[in-house]
Amino acid sequence: MKTLYSLRRFYPVETLFNGTLALAGRDQETTGFAWWAGNARLINLSGKLLGAHVAHAGLIVFWAGAMNLFEVAHFVPEKPMYEQGLILLPHLATLGWGVGPGGEVIDTFPYFVSGVLHLISSAVLGFGGIYHALLGPETLEESFPFFGYVWKDRNKMTTILGIHLILLGIGAFLLVLKALYFGGVYDTWAPGGGDVRKITNLTLSPSVIFGYLLKSPFGGEGWIVSVDDLEDIIGGHVWLGSICIVGGIWHILTKPFAWARRALVWSGEAYLSYSLGALSVFGFIACCFVWFNNTAYPSEFYGPTGPEASQAQAFTFLVRDQRLGANVGSAQGPTGLGKYLMRSPTGEVIFGGETMRFWDLRAPWLEPLRGPNGLDLSRLKKDIQPWQERRSAEYMTHAPLGSLNSVGGVATEINAVNYVSPRSWLATSHFVLGFFLFVGHLWHAGRARAAAAGFEKGIDRDFEPVLSMTPLN
């Protein structure tokens, strides 16, 4: 079962580096890969590959638990989360754990529980990983045919795909259940400055949910990143979970159609490239989502978005100068446009100055001051509440910008708060990881296609240039 076909046919890339180091029969000679090629040695050893994946999951979950407890240990309830360099607690707070009105943390115990549960889970996964890597069967096909597979078995591969889709669908429904029945989630739009609430009136209309996918990605539209109410987010998860589960069942019950059998490459490396491509897309979408969206990523926990900080500064100075007697409705700025307020090309009243580029920002502290034609002058003169002033002054000084030059007019003098926004971290890290995953997708897709076409030869190791060079020492 292990050697259904010539290893040289499917691994023609010669990778001799240190052929003498043998690891439990998984050496260069038997696999075509040297020790440093990592899991490539395990391509046809389903049991050992399972061990590697379970151990990897254990490392991931261990990091989550340890980092979670580290953040709990360092957490100062009197300071905003986004001032403390936290990247995990904001996610737990967004799910409604431990927070009250205005995003104030009232109980850190749920965060502690989360960390401990992840640590315990990681121990179980770590044990399973070590067991399958060292003690379990090398291949699962003989003893546990349900869990065994051969990479070119198209029907088995789509069955595995189906199982994964069902698990993803269940994950989507876990969020739905939390929002509907288990305490609700944090809603930054709740009246008075945000609160935890149960989401009862879900948006299930397909025209609304799928309308997001048909929107333009540009300003004022913003594709799915423009979602700004939790009913749509949770309703979207109902749709997504249902599609994943139905699609998973379909993939388990069916075999690939002829066009799919012809169009796709059916090898382990090809599946790796497909997965990396998908993860890359997820990374780029997540980057835009965390950078621009303050509903799924509330500013109370992640800090303001870039546009939000810029608009908050314009609002703060409008409030100040209006108190000092300025007529904010008619004051002219240095360019001849309105200094505080101006009209957009389509006629709405928007903030003037450099922040005009962020005219389409929506934020809970600003929306009450809008009327049917944009910002309402009479509300700006009579209805501004103290909490809106405090919130905007706080956001103005916590822009997620570092020290960029083009910052939408935000004052970034060097005496500002020593501060890196978690929004910056999360957006940047997901962009960078998305890019690396995309490069990995191209690399493995190219190798998989070349191997399938039969012309991947690799370097001729007998006459490799480095062999004739003098040693470095």
Curated annotation (Swiss-Prot):
Assigned GO CC terms: chloroplast thylakoid membrane; photosystem II
Cystine pairings recorded for this chain: none
GO molecular function: chlorophyll binding; electron transporter, transferring electrons within the cyclic electron transport pathway of photosynthesis activity; metal ion binding
Cross-referenced InterPro entries: PS_antenna-like (IPR000932), PS_II_antenna-like_sf (IPR036001), PSII_PsbC (IPR005869), PSII_PsbC_sf (IPR044900)
Record PTM Phosphothreonine, positions in chain: T15
Propiece residues: 1-14
Primary location: plastid
Protein name, UniProt field: Photosystem II CP43 reaction center protein
Source organism of the structure: Buxus microphylla (Littleleaf boxwood)
Annotated gene: psbC
